[in-house]
Amino acid sequence: MFDPAVFAARRDAFMKVLGPSGVAVMRSLPERLRNGDAFHPFRQHSDVFYLTGFVEPDTTLVLRPGAETERIVMFVRPRDPEVEIWDGRRAGLEGAKETYGADAAYTTAELPTRLWELIANHEELHFSLGLDDQMDLLVGSAIARLRKSEKRGKRPPRAVVDPRVALHELRLHKRPEELVALRTACRITCEAHVAAMKLGRPGVSEHEVEALINYTFRKAGGSGPGYATIVGAGDNATILHYIENTRAIADGDLVLVDAGCEFGHYTADITRTWPASGRFTAAQRKVYEVVLATQKSAVAMAKPGVTIDELHDHCVRSLTEGMIELGLLTGTVDERIADSTYRKFYMHGTSHWLGLDVHDVGAYTREGKARPLAPGMVITVEPGLYIARDAPDVPAELRGIGIRIEDDLVITEAGNDVLTAACPKEIADVERACAR
């Protein structure tokens, strides 16, 4: 969906960081078997996509900023009319050059024989060890061959550096075209959540709600969910990453849905919790109001200069106050934070980066300190309370209640812009959306 110039600009920015003496080798993962001879749907490695827009498996990108020729080299699957009848069209070598910006393109099968020359005589090799055993062996073999060739003027790189440090810094700061994709993903996701609220009444199964959500993603032009859709009814909502989605929704249940559409490889990440009956009970309303007030105040805090740690600390304090008011905890707020007892009911972080990956890349610290938010960063804000059905020493009417409210924000010069504002979260708006 992006113009080739977008990917060219990204490569230029990354190669500027590499410098003329650096060479980067980046590999997509191969297709993975699901079972038998059936494969999982392939999704390109986010780093490779960010730099190329190329979506086929078995791809290797080599960047050589200081080279006079072959600065951008791609190893790809060749065109094969017979195979393409079965598995779909390929870009091939010409497509890699004409469409994806490669100066030179070779077949994936040629990588073992050509890699050593491409990395020769560079000071630093930027390569991520430990991600792909086969690729580690290829790179190791190339370096070993160069060590044997030093007397003939072909020397190996002096150091191996992880390219993700520099590349993920670029990915952390979203460009305008990325925000367009994220806004679209968020808009579609909001539509899917509202549709789920209307469907998810007693007697409907969790998997029916999941099916409607994923259908809405695809119908609106998304590629599908950016991660496994969570539909947790009743006490299933107290399981953070519940993805079985097999239970029938019962009268009196709350339904927690955590779902995000992927659009143009960028994913949204929204959580909403709503009453299957269409109206919150008094107990559900009390817990929901605690989470909602906490979430809204944290969203209001998010601006340049504030850290994710500060957002989390704020939510911990606000939720702990609520836990005491609800009768979940006793003592003072400071005592319960100091001994971490609050983690019985709020055990996860408040925010994470969002982008090509649902838990997107980028360091949360700089020079040992929490990193301040800056314009162009996209984050989630997602506090919650999870009261297990067998939780001891808590009011009986609160057991089995799980509530999370999550929005996606882009940090701006003036503060933040909530990308998911169209998704209902106020009690009256949620109940209105649930009306059938």
Regions found by a protein language model. Give the residues of each.
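Active-site neighborhoods and metal-handling regions in enzymes and metal-associated proteins
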Residues: 1-436
